[in-house]
Amino acid sequence: MNRRPLHFVTREKEWELIQRSETIVDSSSFDPSDTAVIMASPDYSATVAMHLAHAWSRDGDALSIIPVDVTYPDEDSQYYIDKMRSQYIDITKFKKLILVEACIIRGGNWEWMLNVLQDDFRYNRKDITLVTMVENINSRVKSDYVAEYYDDDKQENMFYYEKYNKHWPIR
């Protein structure tokens, strides 16, 4: 089996990307009283979301974190869309949202999440900030802030904690 070379994110690299994200994101309008972090894909994004929510704290108050499960590439998104819709009350009590994801490969999860937030929850795009540590240059939805880009056609992104996952196609 031939695999693409890895774009491997070590624990040290993850920390570097988190710190870079803290630095590049304009957090001047983030206020814990009206802004929340949406932790997309908690199994991958818990670490970065937690660090950023605390880094963007004001007067000793960290941003709230709301976990949202997302699809793997081989899953239908409808279940996850319905599940996010069930979080309406938790999410809409905030005026601004920062969606945080460890890695954006295709952009499909950003796409349906933005659709739910804008069409169902009535958020304006200007009140939603998309942040990722790593993004494929060919993602169909582009994040507002990216700590590092890679090319998924040439490399396979992998984090140090990942093991075999039946949902990820090997190509």
Language-model regions, residue ranges each:
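A structural signal for isolated positions on well-ordered beta-strands in alpha/beta enzyme cores
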Residues: 37, 66, 98, 129-132
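Short, glycine/charge-rich flexible loops or terminal/linker lids adjacent to PRPP-binding catalytic cores
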Residues: 54-97, 105-115
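A general structural motif
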Residues: 32-35, 62, 92-96, 125-127
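Glycine-rich helix-loop-beta junction characteristic of Rossmann-like nucleotide cofactor-binding loops
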Residues: 25-32, 88-92, 121
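Active-site-facing substrate-recognition patch
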Residues: 1-32
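Short glycine-rich phosphate-binding loop at a beta-alpha junction
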Residues: 31-44
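PRPP-dependent phosphoribosyltransferase catalytic core
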Residues: 3-8, 31, 115-171
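A short acidic (Asp/Glu
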Residues: 47-52, 109-112, 141
